[in-house]
C-alpha cells in the first residue's frame, strides 16, 4: 500500500498539490504514522470507530510520539477522527486521491465496502485518477475466497481496473491479508 501511495504522492507533488488520503480504520495507526513521517505532502484523515483503539495507539504504539516529532497533527497533515468510517465517507463532499480501507471486525472487512453500494460510494469520493486500496482477509481461490470474490465483483462493476496483491501467492487457498487495488 505504501508503495502505491508514495508514487501517487510524488505525482501530486509534481503538480504542486497535496495528496488527499482517507484511511478507514486506524487500528495501530501504522499507515498514518508512515504517511506523517515520510510523505510530507499528504493530507490524511484517519477514521477509527473505537476511541479505545486510538487511545491505545497513542499510548502504546507511539502515535503521540510520531505526531510530536512530525508536527503532522498540528499542521493539519494528519487528522484523527473517531467515527464510523462508512458513515463518515457517505457524509463527505471531499474527493480523495487515495481511499484506504483498513477497517476490520475480526477477520471481516467493513461490511458495506464489499457491496455494489460500497463500490459506488467509494468511486463517487475518488478524484480523477484516484485509487482505492483495501486489506481483504480472504483466500484468493477455493472455498474460503468468497469475501475477495464479492469485493472483486462489486468493484469490478464500478472501476476500470481491479487487481489483487496476494499475501500467499504460492498458496492461493490459504486465507491471507491481500491488498485489493481499484482504479
Question: Where do the language-model regions lie?
Answer:
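The AdoMet/dcAdoMet-binding core of the Class I SAM-like
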Residues: 1-133, 139-152, 156-158, 170-175, ...
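Short secondary-structure junctions
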Residues: 160-165
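Flexible, glycine-/basic-rich loop-and-beta segments that form/coincide
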Residues: 183
Amino acid at each position: 500500500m505504501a508503495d502505491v501511495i508514495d508514487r501517487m504522492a510524488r505525482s501530486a507533488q509534481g503538480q504542486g498539490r497535496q495528496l488527499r488520503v482517507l484511511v478507514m480504520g486506524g487500528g495501530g495507526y501504522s499507515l498514518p504514522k508512515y504517511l506523517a513521517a515520510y510523505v510530507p505532502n499528504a493530507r490524511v484523515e484517519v477514521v477509527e470507530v473505537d476511541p479505545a483503539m486510538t487511545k491505545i495507539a497513542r499510548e502504546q504504539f507511539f502515535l503521540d510520539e510520531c505526531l510530536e516529532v512530525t508536527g503532522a497533527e498540528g499542521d493539519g497533515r494528519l487528522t484523527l477522527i473517531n467515527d464510523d468510517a462508512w458513515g463518515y465517507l457517505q457524509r463527505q463532499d471531499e474527493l480523495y486521491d487515495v481511499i484506504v480501507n483498513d477497517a476490520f471486525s475480526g477477520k471481516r472487512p467493513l461490511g458495506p465496502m464489499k457491496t455494489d453500494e460500497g463500490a459506488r460510494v467509494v468511486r463517487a469520493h475518488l478524484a480523477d485518477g484516484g485509487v482505492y486500496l483495501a486489506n481483504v482477509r480472504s483466500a484468493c481461490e477455493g472455498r474460503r475466497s468468497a469475501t475477495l470474490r464479492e469485493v472483486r465483483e462489486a468493484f469490478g462493476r464500478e472501476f476500470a481496473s481491479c487487481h489483487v496483491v496476494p499475501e500467499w501467492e504460492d498458496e492461493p487457498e490459504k486465507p491471507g491479508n491481500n491488498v485489493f487495488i481499484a482504479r
